[in-house]
Amino acid sequence: MSWIARDTDLNPNMTQAEQENNVNIIAAYFRNEGWTDNAIAAMLGNMQVESYLNPAQWQHGLNYSMSGGFGLVQWTPATKLSDYLGAGWRTDYDGQLDRIRYEWQNELQWTWNVAMTFHDFAVSTDTVDQLTYVFLRNYENPEDWTASITVRRTNANNWYTYLGNTPTPALGIPIWLLFKIRWRGR
């Protein structure tokens, strides 16, 4: 499955099917890391407001400025992501997920506006509404978080419903290889 991305600082006009394509990639990645669907949906609801789920999204109105935000979660400044990923960073969309994993594993980018660690967030079975709020306040942390909490929660709950009807694509070792390894071990 390939990412759908539009390099723009405007609304990329992503269709529902295009957003679902990117959601499938994101969900498979973080399910493989052990995240709950509640946490994944909360992150997706926030990402949809930040970037329309477009991994090549630049911050609106800043004319592709590196001092503005970029990517799924709008890393600000964009150098947070470019310095981490190095050459080819603008099209390394899987690398954005690796960056989030790195931040999660090292408790980076995470503030303490709400008393929950990034580790606890990822495995939480709290409500999607609560986790959307936690991700907004502890990760995104905009100046006026009240302006978009309702739409972020609506998005997150929609993605939670979607994820409940979407099986996880296989990642890692193919099942046939596991049987081959087991058979050789006899």
Each model region followed by its residue ranges:
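Residue-level signal for the start and early helices of compact helical domains
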Residues: 44, 63-66, 150
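Short, functionally critical alpha-helical segments immediately adjacent to catalytic or ligand/cofactor-binding
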Residues: 38-54, 100, 134-136
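Short amphipathic alpha-helical interaction patches enriched in hydrophobic/aromatic residues
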Residues: 30, 83-85, 139, 143
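A charged, amphipathic interaction segment
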Residues: 96-165
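Peptidoglycan-targeting cell-wall enzymes and recognition modules
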Residues: 3-25, 32, 51-127
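Extracellular cell-wall/glycan-interacting regions and their flexible linkers
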Residues: 1-41, 145-186
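Broad hydrophobic/π-residue packing in well-ordered secondary structure
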Residues: 27, 73, 138-140
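Hydrophobic/aromatic-lined pockets within catalytic cores
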Residues: 31, 35, 48-52, 105, ...
